[in-house]
Amino acid sequence: MINIRKTHPLMKIINNSFIDLPAPSNISSWWNFGSLLGICLVIQILTGLFLAMHYTSDTTTAFSSVTHICRDVNYGWLIRYLHANGASMFFICLFLHVGRGLYYGSYMFLETWNIGVLLLFAVMATAFMGYVLPWGQMSFWGATVITNLLSAIPYIGSDLVQWIWGGFSVDKATLTRFFAFHFILPFIIAALAGVHLLFLHETGSNNPTGISSDADKIPFHPYYTIKDILGALLLILILTTLVLFSPDLLGDPDNYTPANPLNTPPHIKPEWYFLFAYAILRSIPNKLGGVLALVLSILVLAFIPLLHTSKQRSMMFRPISQCLFWILVADLLTLTWIGGQPVEHPFIIIGQLASILYFLLILVLMPITSLLENNLLKW
């Protein structure tokens, strides 16, 4: 009997991607985050779809419609908090996924890595626009502050900002277009994730050692399907715990106050997952410089393959590079903390030092250390 799984045009693609895919025998739990990100995206699209059925993208009714979802719609509160905290889980998985790529040298798959960087930008844009939709105080002022940064672009800046706003301030036109973009972008992200996977399967997965695993492959199913299911269960456990016990833990209380253009909140800050970039933005006194640093804080990931000077791919056998990697992680945590603090002494100087260290580590210290390790190993 002909095996339909291997012959049917559509089933064949699924089979070669998730069932008979040859995978390295030694990939650890750090390789689980790709599938977890896929699950997060599905959760976000489904909950978002149901929220969109009850949401109205009008400045006069947006805040009320979110309240209506939470109070009057059957399990509306659950859908809303799954969506809000699902975004947090999405970013946790994203950061761990990127960190894994940095540590084990997965960035040597250039196409896969660059599409990954593009995906990161797309997810960040989607999350930012989603945060504006409830039309609370932090939604409105966050949108005002961040869109205003584009005015730092020479010559076309102010025109560009008005074009994005659809007027002379963040208003109804802005909210409507942000809702439209927030709805369409996740589907673009899903398509990009498909391309990401396509390029990954051209080369096969990397593994912790960083050396070729062609000599020792195992089928994806059942070994890694069962491993991914375990990861998914843990993800869902953490998400449901967060949603059911402390749904507002990661949110901002200011967003429970309806947007008021006449009253500025004392501390304007984005959601926690943008705080590291926000801290880098604030640490530079010049507006254009700050915007460039903000973009570069993410875009620097695209340059990492060019900065790889080591003879080894992975950091598994490079203790000095490992030290620098964990200093980078600590630095990012410091930046996240600083981003949530008011602009006053000593937070200003800590933020500036942490920002300098961030770029110094990635652009200077890590490549030099890799060269040093090559010499120490007499390579």
UniProtKB/Swiss-Prot annotation:
UniProt subcellular location: Mitochondrion inner membrane
This protein's UniProt keywords: Electron transport, Heme, Iron, Membrane, Metal-binding, Mitochondrion, Mitochondrion inner membrane, Respiratory chain, Transmembrane, Transmembrane helix, Transport, Ubiquinone
Superkingdom in the source lineage: Eukaryota
Cofactor: heme b
The protein's assembly and partners: The cytochrome bc1 complex contains 11 subunits: 3 respiratory subunits (MT-CYB, CYC1 and UQCRFS1), 2 core proteins (UQCRC1 and UQCRC2) and 6 low-molecular weight proteins (UQCRH/QCR6, UQCRB/QCR7, UQCRQ/QCR8, UQCR10/QCR9, UQCR11/QCR10 and a cleavage product of UQCRFS1). This cytochrome bc1 complex then forms a dimer.
Principal subcellular localisation of the protein: mitochondrion
Membrane-topology descriptor: Multi-pass membrane protein
Organism: Nectogale elegans (Elegant water shrew)
Gene: MT-CYB
A Pfam short name: Cytochrom_B_C
A cellular component annotation (GO) from this entry: respiratory chain complex III
InterPro entries: Cyt_b/b6_C (IPR005798), Cyt_b/b6_C_sf (IPR036150), Cyt_b/b6_N (IPR005797), Cytb/b6-like_sf (IPR027387), Cytochrome_b (IPR030689), Cytochrome_b_C_euk/bac (IPR048260), Cytochrome_b_N_euk/bac (IPR048259), Di-haem_cyt_TM (IPR016174)
Example of a GO MF term: ubiquinol-cytochrome-c reductase activity
Annotated heme b b562 binding sites: H83, H182
Other observations noted: Heme 1 (or BL or b562) is low-potential and absorbs at about 562 nm, and heme 2 (or BH or b566) is high-potential and absorbs at about 566 nm.
Identification of the protein by name: Cytochrome b
Transmembrane stretches, start-end: 33-53, 77-98, 113-133, 178-198, 226-246, 288-308, 320-340, 347-367
Positions contributing to a ubiquinone binding: H201
Cofactor note: Binds 2 heme b groups non-covalently.
GO biological process assignments: mitochondrial electron transport, ubiquinol to cytochrome c
Binding site for heme b b566: H97, H196
Function: Component of the ubiquinol-cytochrome c reductase complex (complex III or cytochrome b-c1 complex) that is part of the mitochondrial respiratory chain. The b-c1 complex mediates electron transfer from ubiquinol to cytochrome c. Contributes to the generation of a proton gradient across the mitochondrial membrane that is then used for ATP synthesis.
Family designation: Belongs to the cytochrome b family.
